[in-house]
Structures are given as structure tokens and as C-alpha cells.
Amino acid sequence: MIKTLMGSIRDYMRVTVATPLLVLGEVLCEMLIPFITANLIDAIKDGATVAQMLPTAGFLVLIALTSLAFGAAAGVTCSHASCGFAKNLRHDLFYKIQTFSFANIDEFSSSSLVTRLTTDINNVQQAFMMLIRIAVRAPLVLVFAFAMAYAMGGSVAMVYLVIIPLLGFGLFFIIYKVRPIFARVFRKYDALNESVEENVTGMRVVKSYVREDFEKEKFATAARDVQMDFTRAEKLLAFNNPMMNICVNGAFVVIIYLGSKLIITSQGTLFDVGQLSSIFTYGFQILMSLMQLSMIFVMVTMADESAHRITEVLAAEPTIANPAEPVLEVADGSIDFDHVSFKYSAHAKRQALDDIDLHIKSGETIGIIGGTGSAKSTLVNLIARLYDATEGTVRVGGMDVRDYDLDALRHQVAMVLQKNVLFSGTIAENLRWGDPNATDEEVREAAHLACADEFVDGFPKGYDTWIEQGGSNVSGGQKQRLCIARALLRRPKILILDDSTSAVDTKTDAKIRAGLASYLPNTTKLIIAQRISSVQDADRIIVMEDGRIAQIGNHDELLKTSEIYRETFTSQNKMSAEGEGAVETDTEASATQAQTQEGGEAHE
């Protein structure tokens, strides 16, 4: 774990190493100050003049200023090192996540990854800052202060040697009890972040179902769980300072007693006031170093769990990776599933896809329908290698998808997923995800083919209109059309529309399909839909049921051979007819009402 985290120091290694060295200089200067002060006190007691004390006093000021300079420099280098380390660590973690497949994301969950990128890295940064400065300073002060106190006070200073093990034992016991609580707290932070993420992304649904109170209670419960565990930890940590103060103050009482007795009995020959004053000063330094050490232990205990969570992500191997010698060119848009089976987890009892044998020619338009949970989306996810088949082989352009460079493959397989996602930025910037070099004319053409220009041109800023995070300021249908336009700009060899026109009307749906056919005539198109009208013009239609291909054929063939397809077609036509009838009835009623009103007005 430490080796993994240290890899993120990189270009900040010089300031990281410089910080402890500067701290060492600061501590050495600080240790001299009580010693020089004791000499000044003795000189005053012996009746030295101001002129005689000036060199010693000047040296004391010089040492104090030097200590201040070392301390200030250590503070600057420590800040640079810790902030740079956190920046690199955040960079490494984020870049690692970019290599993850869907399976890796499913393993960690998005809310947990957000916590690791934010809260956990902040904790590790704070611990790193304390380790390179305070964790160096505190032990040095402790050792040097005790050594100087012993040199000046002999057996009187041995009192400190008794309290240090007592405090160490007490601190170890507290940390032993607190550590598992912090581990539990960070797991609950994930639940808290998940609650916030769900609420913010689903705000419209929350408000439409008047679920604000429920969401408030859910968030309050998650926040209360975090609070309760933190409170338990803080209650245990609260014993630390009182325990330390009791031990150190007790030591001071004993030192005053022993020191005073020694001064009186020896009449200042074996032990004097200057030495006693220095021992007290060193005692305060020992106290401060012990308090700093306890702070370090607490911070490191918190950061230890965060560090484990971070390294868990950094050490995770992407389930999907590039081969040693990848193929960089996709020949065409042909797709072959050779007896493919797939399950999301190795421990799953049933296959999500079971023995799929399917062969699609380049340039074909394939419709895919089936009930919820029939694995339609799972099937197409294997084409872009978002998941790897458990059994069998998926080939694109005649090559096993596992032999391709991932970027090369995915650049030729444009997917408009079931969950449409837009990013913060202008409409034009979002569309250029498909092709960063697309001209304004190409952007407008793609938007026109996806029927997105119908609403974009109505915005005051047109294609420069700002899209909020997740596309929250556009409707579901508008979002779908923008995502289709984005995919069109890529001009891929394979285009997959996963229920991507469900939020648009049938007329717009038909216009989009016509645009696809004219704009990408040689592109293989796979259209997943719930409406049969969206796929009935396809070259072939696949009917999925329980992870298997139940039937394949064109529209007319399936009406004869597939009961599922026929029933779906009949029920949708019936609903459509009833809807049209209702519209006609409403129209007639409106006309009758209008005639009645006109007659009444004429009569008046």
C-alpha cells in the first residue's frame, strides 16, 4: 500500500525530502534555546552586567530567528509536497477509473468511487502532510528535549521516562478501539453520497411523485449513521487529552518537588533555579510533542482506511484490457456471435445470454425487440466490448473483438445507450464528442438528421446553449435526439440505438430512421425498440426472450411465425387505433361545441 501511494509523489519528491531536513534544523535550534536561557538566568543570578550578557542574548535571538526561518521554510515545502501529492494521487485514481470496464464500475459503485476521489484523498493528504513534518518534528523534539533535560537535571528528568510508556499504552488502546469505527464510517459515507447522487439526478421524479419528505428522511438516516459512528470515535478520542494532561502535570508536580528539594539540600551546588527552569521548558516541549504524536496517530488511523480504499482501486485490474499486439483497423461492420453465453458475475446461477448464434452482414439494419429483462442491451454491449463474453466468440469485421485495440474498436461502434447522458457544456461541445474536428455545418447536419434542430434553433443561443450537468435543462426526447446526433457525427461502421427514440413521437421516430438510412447507408445499424413501428422496416428483426434468440426474420415473416411478435404488434396497433379514435371523438366534440357557441352568439 505504501509503495503504491509513494508512486504518486513523483515530481514533488525534492520538496518532500527537503521538509524533514528543514524540520531537523528547526528542532536543533529550538533545543538550544532553553539551554542558552538557563545560562542567562545563572548569569543574572551571579550578578553579570548587561554588557556581559549581550553576546549570549544576541546569540539567543539569532538561534530563535534561525529556528523561525527553518520552520517557515518547512511549512512552505510541506504545503507544496502535500498538495502536489494529492493532485497526483487524484490524477492517478481518476485515470485508473477511466480504464475500468462496466464490470469494474459495478464492483465499486459510482458513489463509492466519488468518495474515494474526494473524502478519502483529502484524508490521505492530511496524513501525508503530518507525516513529513509533524511526525518528524514530534519524535525529534521528544528525544532531544529528554536528552537535554537529562543532561541538565539528571535523575530529576527521569520522571519523563516513566510517563512516556504510560501515555503510549493509553494511546495504543484508544487507537485499537477507534480504528474499526473509522472503517465503518467510510462505508457509511458511500451510502450518504449515494443518497445525495440519487436525489440530485432524480430531482424531477422526486418532485413529480412528491417524495421530498421521504428523500429527506433517507438522507437524514444516512447522515445520522455517519454522525453516530463519528460520535463514538470522538468519545473515545476525548480521553486522550485529559489522560495526557494528568500524566504530564503529575510529572511537573513531582519535578517541582524533587528539584526544589535538591536545590534546598545542596544550596544550589548540585541543582539550581536555571536548571529547573530549563527542565520545565523541555517538559513543555515533551508535552507538545506527545500531543502532536497523538494527533498524528488519530489522523493516520483515519487515513489508513482511506488509503486502503484508494489502493484497492489503484491495484484493481481492468477486466477488459488491450491485447499485447492489438488490431488497429476495423475492416467492416459485419458482426458475428458464435455460440456466445454471458453472465454478469462468475457466481451468478443463470446466464444473462445463453448460446447466441447470430451473423449480421455489414450494412444490414437489424431490429431487436423483446420484453424487459430479455437481455437486449446485454447483447449489444458485447459488440463494443463493454463486457467480455463468458463463452463463445464475438467478432466484428471478421476479427475477435478481444484482438482489437479498444479505442480503435469503440471508435467504429457508436452507441446511443438506454440511459442518455449529456455533459456540462454547450450543445455544440456535446455533439462534438462524436467528432472533435466536426465543422459547424457538419454539427448542424447531424442535428437535422436527428431532428434536434427543431428545438435547438428555438433556443436564443442556438448551438451555444449551455447544457447543465446530466442534461437536466432539456427534456428526455430532446436529450435522446442530441445523443443520436452525437453518434451520427462519428460516422461509425456500426451504429447501435438502444431504445433511443422511446421519448419521441412516432412521426419524429420515422424521420430519424429515414435520416439514418440516407446519411449512413453502409453502416450496420442495430435498433433496440419497444415499438414495432421503429423496427418493422429493418432487414431482419430479432425477437429476444430470456436471454435467447426466440425468432429471426423480417416483419412479414415474424407476423406469421412468432407469437410474441404478433401479439406485440396487435396490441400496439389496437392501442394506436383507440388513441386515434379518442382524438377523432374529441375533435368532433370540439366542433359541435364550437357550432353551438357560434349559434348562440348569432342568436344574441
Describe every region a protein language model picked out.
Residues 11, 99-103, 119-132, 136, ...:
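An intracellular "coupling" helix at the cytosolic face of ABC transporter transmembrane type-1 domains
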Residues 46-49, 53-58, 148-162, 171, ...:
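Helix-loop-helix
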